[in-house]
Amino acid sequence: MKKIFFTLSLIFTLIVFAGCGEKKQPLKIYSIIHEEETKALTDLFTKRTGIPVVFLRASTGELVNRVIAEKNDPQADILLGGATNYHIQANKAGALESYKSPLAEKVPPYAKSADDTYTGFCVLTLGIGINKGRFESKFPGKKYPATWDDLLDPAFKGEIVLTNPVASSTAYLFVQNQLQRLGEEKGWDYLLKLAPLVGQFPDSGSAPAKLLGTGEYAVGVSYLHAVAKYGADGFDVATIAPPETVGDVDCIAIMKNSKNLDAAKKFVDFMLSAEAQELMSSIDFTIPVNPDAKGAKGSIPVSKLDLIDYDVAKAAEQKESVLSKWSLNVK
């Protein structure tokens, strides 16, 4: 269905622009970020440049696997979104093009690759989300979990929602958060104690925030900005930034052998601009990477977070073995 949607969207775009005086080849994007953000950003890009855009929105795992499989004949020009370890994976497979944007100098070193194959455009921080009404109904008088270890309370069994790390970069980041803060042995002990308490492992990284917002679960592991957005929209949720959490960045990359390289470079430049990052923050409460961009009211500055020294390269190297172990041990 998604492939059909992408194809039909492309055909529709080509038909529309066939009648224009100047024909421009549409930029094709695989997007991991939310559809609302993707549409707003691509609409603004088209307005600023006149370059038409078509996009396919799907989960991180699905799109990164597609990028790698298509590396010799890419069906898109841009991979938009996804944590750094997934871009490292695609780069190691030879699927990404090197491009240093003029705006890359504004991006801090932790948010870009040394070889200019991927660049971060917003900071993502993992935390705990609470549906206040459901929590207080299920656990009257109980304090909200304030640390990662608090989630191991047996009372929470069935009331926790955590994304499936095999399908989602959000949950894989959580898995690595525990392995890196506790060490391999204690980290796996933690994860295997937590798993039986989880009521649902959806595939989409955005699902926990949504399920918390609708009151289907009391506690969830999610990016803080995703839960904060539901709070701003009037849902009965709270965000908690536990100590020793982890931060990462959503990245953008150009496909190796892109058929529309000039337009792809312009889109990377656009995504690193203050204008694009402020637009994204206004929609989804993400924290801009560009220091000239202002984050939306309600977004949590990086300076106020207790972050571990996250080893991105290690997370990427271990990905296959860690997910294999997860699949074997978590049913």
Residue ranges of model-derived segments:
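A bilobed periplasmic-binding-protein/Venus flytrap-type ligand-binding module shared by bacterial periplasmic
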Residues: 129-134, 249-260, 279-280
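Bacterial signal peptide processing site
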Residues: 21-23
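A ligand-binding cleft/hinge motif common to bilobed small-molecule-binding domains
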Residues: 85-89, 213, 217-236, 284
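Periplasmic-binding protein-like
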Residues: 124, 156-163, 190-195, 201-202, 233-258, 271-293, ...
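Extracytoplasmic ligand-binding site segments that recognize negatively charged/polar headgroups
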Residues: 28, 32-39, 61, 75-216
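Short, polar/charged alpha-helical segment
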Residues: 32-54, 128, 230
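C-terminal motif of bacterial Sec signal peptides marking the signal peptidase cleavage site
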Residues: 16-19
